[in-house]
């Protein structure tokens, strides 16, 4: 039954809201009664109207999600000490195995940074590696060093620009964003490279970053393809853009 088919009373019998009883005259003005009941018994009313049917309202029931959320909150915050494991015990690896390897002092705790996990030698010599714990920013961690754990150089910081690092890209032109199409094309061209600041000379690779295959090289499209691309990038001029199109 739809909302406006009030004959069978989807929200209750249509006569109970208007106060009319069925009586013996079975079909009196059915449409007016249904219309009055439809608007008076509207369930989504603002506030409490005197026409709401209180005996038809469903009572609230406990959702199974409420119990699970309550149990989860009690497990995390209830017993008082469980949620403090990750937050307060980062200086020692006794509770949950997590350890703040970047901010610890030289207490000789375990392997120095990536030395133990990366297979660097002497990871268990705690007192010997204690001084190297704070020097993790450089490549000198632990006994074996972070370079021994796979040969990957440690990037100094996430905020260090590429032009300040040297060794990851051929950054003779500064940031790799500045490598326009042919400005540094000869740098990585034939695979000889420049070898800036003592890095190996084969960084240029097969074409390199600065060559014509740079990731942001200026591509020039000519001919019919250019006209087709330019026409497809812009909307037709006779097309009116209404704001509801963006919402839809």
UniProtKB/Swiss-Prot annotation:
Span list, region Disordered: 116-191
Example GO molecular function: DNA binding
Ribonucleoprotein in keyword set: no
Cellular component terms (Gene Ontology): nucleus
Principal cellular location given in the protein's record: nucleus
Taxonomy, superkingdom: Eukaryota
Residue spans crossing the bilayer: none
Bias (Low complexity): 126-139
Family from the record: Belongs to the Antp homeobox family.
Function: Sequence-specific transcription factor which is part of a developmental regulatory system that provides cells with specific positional identities on the anterior-posterior axis. Binds the consensus region 5'-TTAAT[GT][GA]-3'.
Name of the featured protein: Homeotic protein ultrabithorax
Source species: Musca domestica (House fly)
Classification lineage: Eukaryota, Metazoa, Ecdysozoa, Arthropoda, Hexapoda
């Amino acid at each position: 039954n739809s909302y406006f088919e009030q004959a069978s009373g989807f929200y209750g019998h249509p006569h109970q809201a208007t106060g009319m009883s069925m009586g013996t005259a079975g079909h009196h003005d059915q449409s007016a009664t249904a219309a009055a009941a439809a608007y008076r018994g509207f369930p989504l009313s603002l506030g409490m109207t005197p026409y709401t049917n209180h005996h038809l309202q469903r009572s609230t029931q406990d959702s199974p999600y409420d119990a699970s959320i309550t149990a989860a909150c009690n497990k995390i915050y209830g017993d008082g000490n469980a949620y403090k494991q990750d937050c307060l015990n980062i200086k020692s690896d006794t509770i949950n195995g997590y350890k703040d390897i970047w901010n610890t002092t030289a207490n000789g705790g375990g392997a120095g940074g990536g030395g133990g996990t990366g297979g660097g030698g002497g990871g268990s010599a705690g007192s010997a590696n204690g001084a190297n714990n704070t020097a993790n920013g450089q490549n000198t961690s632990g006994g074996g060093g972070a370079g021994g754990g796979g040969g990957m150089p440690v990037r100094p910081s996430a905020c260090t620009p590429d032009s300040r690092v040297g060794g990851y890209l051929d950054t003779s032109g500064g940031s790799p964003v500045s490598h326009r199409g042919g400005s540094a094309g000869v740098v990585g061209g034939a695979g000889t490279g420049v070898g800036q600041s003592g890095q190996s000379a084969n960084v240029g690779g097969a074409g390199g970053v600065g060559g014509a295959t740079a990731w942001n090289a200026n591509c020039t499209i000519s001919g019919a393809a250019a006209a087709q691309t330019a026409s497809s990038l812009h909307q037709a001029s006779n097309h009116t853009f209404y704001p509801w199109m963006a919402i839809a």
